[in-house]
């Protein structure tokens, strides 16, 4: 552009606007490593003001074999349907809420997978001081019930736990009263998925403790979400029906955060 434009984060008078990503990755039989350089000093129109910047916010080293995967550095993860933990990158929306820390994935026997992680979350160009801990367990019952496998039926049970520990901060409700904020908040997720032939059914439920935050206007109330999804597909035909109910289930690593990149 040759004329000043409103990019969504203020008027910009630059001849060159860019969101640039440069990835470098090395892979071997058991060890992977990678880094990513990002340049958004003059970002494309439509991105939030805090999106502007440049640097190397992403880097990792990973060891993996048939039963173990261990990652140190930055990584993305999702437990179940993502009700209590979902970190991901969506460049077209300006979202990258990766975790900086460590993650371990264990597969001790066929049909069992256990994940454990700890880290701090990225928000725009900074790493928050609040710490996230999490664990996830999935069991494929068809690996232990021979008749299920013989009839092409698969049943996966899953459970997740996430804890966020936030630093103490002062939030006033008026000139003389402050909020008594919890230092830690726990959340749990339970789910079951049944697949047989072209039928796929998923039921999931998650609950979290009292979590006063910007999104719920700092109320003291537990949150919960439930979802039931059913789909069927065969050649020339597919159908999907889904029901979901959510109550006070915003769950962010920092209580005062808002904006697109927070989610």
Model-derived regions: residue spans:
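Signature for the C-terminal beta-barrel architecture of outer-membrane proteins
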Residues: 3-17, 26-27, 31-33, 37-53, ...
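Acidic, small-polar-rich N-terminal luminal/periplasmic segments of exported/outer-membrane proteins
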Residues: 40, 54, 58, 75-81, ...
